[in-house]
């Protein structure tokens, strides 16, 4: 199992969390994606699925211009060397697993994601 991961925003962030792998979420999108995110970020606050589902900043997110090689390297290095930081993510993943539970995890995750989507339309 990996000690840390660098993930593009998407389902891989939830998969990494379920596997208990601390990770950094990075995404650089098109102009349209950036504009869309700017319009809804005050309503949702996060882009990574673990953060969205827990409504908390569990995994660091570097988006667009913040996703510089230096920042990515610094964050990944911190995940690998700072045991407290990695432990904090793993504790968050444990809360995520409690939220998602055992049977019906896909349905519950989808419902939470739909709740967030509905908030952005309100």
Name every feature range the model reports, one short phrase each:
Residues 1-122:
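Nucleotide-activated sugar donor-binding and catalytic core shared by glycosyltransferases
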């Amino acid at each position: 199992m990996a000690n840390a991961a660098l993930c593009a925003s998407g389902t891989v962030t939830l998969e990494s969390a379920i596997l208990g792998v601390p990770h950094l979420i990075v995404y650089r999108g098109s102009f349209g994606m950036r504009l869309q995110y700017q319009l809804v970020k005050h309503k949702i606050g996060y882009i990574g699925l673990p953060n969205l589902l827990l409504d908390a900043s569990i995994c660091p997110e570097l988006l667009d211009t913040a996703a510089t090689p230096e920042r990515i390297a610094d964050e990944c290095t911190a995940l690998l060397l700072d045991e407290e930081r990695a432990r904090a993510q793993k504790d968050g993943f444990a809360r995520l697993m409690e939220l998602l539970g055992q049977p019906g995890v896909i349905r519950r995750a989808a419902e939470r994601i739909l709740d967030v989507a509905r908030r952005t339309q309100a």
